[in-house]
Amino acid sequence: MKQLYGVIGNPIGHSLSPVMHNDAFEHLNMDAHYHAFLVKEEVLGEAVRGLKALGISGFNVTTPHKVAIMDYLDEIDPLAKQIGAVNTVVHKDGKLIGYNTDGIGFVRALQSISSKPLQEKRILLLGAGGASRAIYFSLADVGVKEIDVANRTVDKAKELITACKATVHSVALSLEKATEEQGNYDIIIQTTTIGMHPRVEHTPLQISSLNKGTIVSDIIYNPFETKILCEAKEQGAMIQNGIDMFVYQGALAFEMWTGRTPNIERMKQLVIRKLGG
């Protein structure tokens, strides 16, 4: 019988997940289908119960349901609980189990371009919202010891640092201070929406004094190269946009559901083509 997977959100028509996952199913000769479900906030509970009753094998969760979904699940993975958001649900033994692959997917993507283990790196996170939280906790979970957080509101950066129970050395910085200190970091990760289309001329941090070999990663993928990435490239940094994070988090969800490993590069090239790259 064909296995059913999907993604729930509102809006959902723009999602590239169905294209990516259905291509992977076809490539691996699997009898499965991935569908995008438009689910409004007021019917989230009914939708989740309906998906469970239909026997869905697993599904992704996107805006605006990543936090609210937690009330309707049977179990939640400890890391997802710590992050406070779920983006992947596995239906196993009659239970819906929630995970967060955003942060771990990002960590895998980052490690794929780093010549040394991330545990040896000093990292600066720009932003203190939901994406930053997922990445911070996931970096801490794999043993990264130095992660500073810069945010427009420094108190919010302090809150994020305080919430993490792992033994991480962290300092909360203003964006102005982070601009001054940028040369002290091996990796800079941009997690805000600043620089996203259509406001492409904006940047949270003016890149001016990076060390050779610094990695600058931006979770935005529209445009492919944000202003911060363009400036970093001019300084000789290695850059990475948000496509890698999107693909790796999707691949991790695919592995959780099926026990199979999809072709990451195939997924990435498909997404780039769909985005017009």
UniProtKB/Swiss-Prot annotation:
Q: Name one GO cellular component term.
A: cytosol
Q: Which domain of life is it from?
A: Bacteria
Q: Which residues does UniProt mark as catalytic?
A: K66
Q: Which UniProt keywords apply?
A: Amino-acid biosynthesis, Aromatic amino acid biosynthesis, NADP, Oxidoreductase
Q: What class of enzyme is it?
A: oxidoreductase
Cite the record's note on assembly.
Homodimer.
Report the sequence similarity comment from the record.
Belongs to the shikimate dehydrogenase family.
Please describe what this protein does: Involved in the biosynthesis of the chorismate, which leads to the biosynthesis of aromatic amino acids. Catalyzes the reversible NADPH linked reduction of 3-dehydroshikimate (DHSA) to yield shikimate (SA).
The record, for NCBIfam families, names: aroE, PRK00258.3-3
Q: What is this protein called?
A: Shikimate dehydrogenase (NADP(+))
Per the UniProt record, the source organism is Bacillus cereus (strain ATCC 10987 / NRS 248)
